[in-house]
Amino acid sequence: MFNISAVAVSYLIGSLSFAVIVSKYYGMDDPRTYGSGNPGATNVLRSGKKKAAALTLLGDAAKGLVAVLLARVLQEPLGLSDSAIAAVALAALVGHMWPVFFGFKGGKGVATALGVLLALSPATALVCALIWLVMAFGFKVSSLAALTATIAAPLAALFFMPHTSWIWATLLIALLVLFRHKSNIVKLLEGRESKIGGSR
């Protein structure tokens, strides 16, 4: 019972779309109506509001971190299994991608996935963050950086995560993020993906 409740709460936390919330607070257009149409930090940055983009990034990462950390703190008192923690991690990302509070139209999950990984394994999250930074500064293409870091996540998890269920969860998280980036993959292959801060 507690396992199911933990997963449900994690999904609801993940469903808080900070791109939409922050944009509304600053009186900006809904990020789903301009640029790529994705409610995420990169698209909010296209509005020219760097502070709003930064807050979106922090909020989306924080909700993944909080959802999983909360479950880990309560794991022993509530008798949550390691598999339940893995499910909680997935639920936070699913909530971000298909949020119940915003018509199931969510983001691509990069920041939230990073927050989730930070709660499961700081070392895994650090590896992914470093790869993202190197690729982002080197190529100035956010999606390429995200895809590279995403592919690296399950490999890093093999070395740093203590439970098999968490490694499988990381693999599923990576597959979901890759799925949500399918249009970006096409643009990358066609050489028309926008640069960080670009208008497309």
From Swiss-Prot:
Gene Ontology CC annotations of this record: plasma membrane
Main location: membrane
Entry keyword set: Cell inner membrane, Cell membrane, Lipid biosynthesis, Lipid metabolism, Membrane, Phospholipid biosynthesis, Phospholipid metabolism, Transferase, Transmembrane, Transmembrane helix
Pfam families in the record: G3P_acyltransf
Positions of transmembrane segments: 2-22, 51-71, 84-104, 114-134, 159-179
Enzyme Commission number(s) of this protein: 2.3.1.275
UniProt keyword annotation of Transmembrane present: yes
Places the protein is found: Cell inner membrane
InterPro entries hit by this protein: G3P_acylTferase_PlsY
Entry superkingdom: Bacteria
Substrates-to-products reaction catalysed: an acyl phosphate + sn-glycerol 3-phosphate = a 1-acyl-sn-glycero-3-phosphate + phosphate
Biological pathway: Lipid metabolism; phospholipid metabolism
An MF annotation (GO) of this entry: acyl-phosphate glycerol-3-phosphate acyltransferase activity
BP GO annotations: phospholipid biosynthetic process
Membrane topology designation: Multi-pass membrane protein
UniProt keyword Cell inner membrane present: yes
Family classification: Belongs to the PlsY family.
Assembly notes: Probably interacts with PlsX.
Reported function: Catalyzes the transfer of an acyl group from acyl-phosphate (acyl-PO(4)) to glycerol-3-phosphate (G3P) to form lysophosphatidic acid (LPA). This enzyme utilizes acyl-phosphate as fatty acyl donor, but not acyl-CoA or acyl-ACP.
Protein's UniProt name: Glycerol-3-phosphate acyltransferase
Organism: Neisseria meningitidis serogroup C (strain 053442)
